[in-house]
Amino acid sequence: MARILGVDIPNDKRVVISLTYIFGIGKSTSQKILKLANIDENIRVNDLADEQIAEIRRVALNFVKANGEKLQLEGDLRRTVAMDIKRLMEIGSYRGIRHRRGLPVRGQRTKTNARTRKGPRKTVANKKIETR
């Protein structure tokens, strides 16, 4: 497995797909990185030369988005997302409250469904009717 930006990317897949295993790189960013590095996106990772892997590393580290910002990847991006969620919870916004309660944040229904966010069902038993 080739190691790029601290992530082992799979050898048996095409380069354009393998780069998406890095947190913060999707398919379109992967295509842009490969275009800047002058590497065909249909090549498999195990067919890449060491110089090509080094070029992908260099381009990915120095990649600048269309708005002029540097691309955040892996740990930095995870930290930024976690801090954003923490900030929402601290200021007490609606989204922060939903995060704190472990409920869906983006307006989904919760009467039914939302099991991924709420966890497994907590069954409540009916009260027994006392007979004399």
Swiss-Prot record:
Keyword Ribonucleoprotein: yes
Pfam families according to UniProt: Ribosomal_S13
InterPro entries to which the protein is assigned, alphabetical: Rbsml_uS13_C (IPR027437), Ribosomal_uS13 (IPR001892), Ribosomal_uS13-like_H2TH (IPR010979), Ribosomal_uS13_bac-type (IPR019980), Ribosomal_uS13_CS (IPR018269)
PROSITE patterns per record: RIBOSOMAL_S13_1, RIBOSOMAL_S13_2
Spans annotated as Disordered: 101-132
Residue ranges, compositional bias (Basic residues): 101-125
GO cellular component: cytosol; small ribosomal subunit
The entry's keywords: Ribonucleoprotein, Ribosomal protein, RNA-binding, rRNA-binding, tRNA-binding
Listed GO MF terms: rRNA binding; structural constituent of ribosome; tRNA binding
Transmembrane region(s): none
GO biological process: translation
Subunit structure, as described in the record: Part of the 30S ribosomal subunit. Forms a loose heterodimer with protein S19. Forms two bridges to the 50S subunit in the 70S ribosome.
Name of the protein in question: Small ribosomal subunit protein uS13
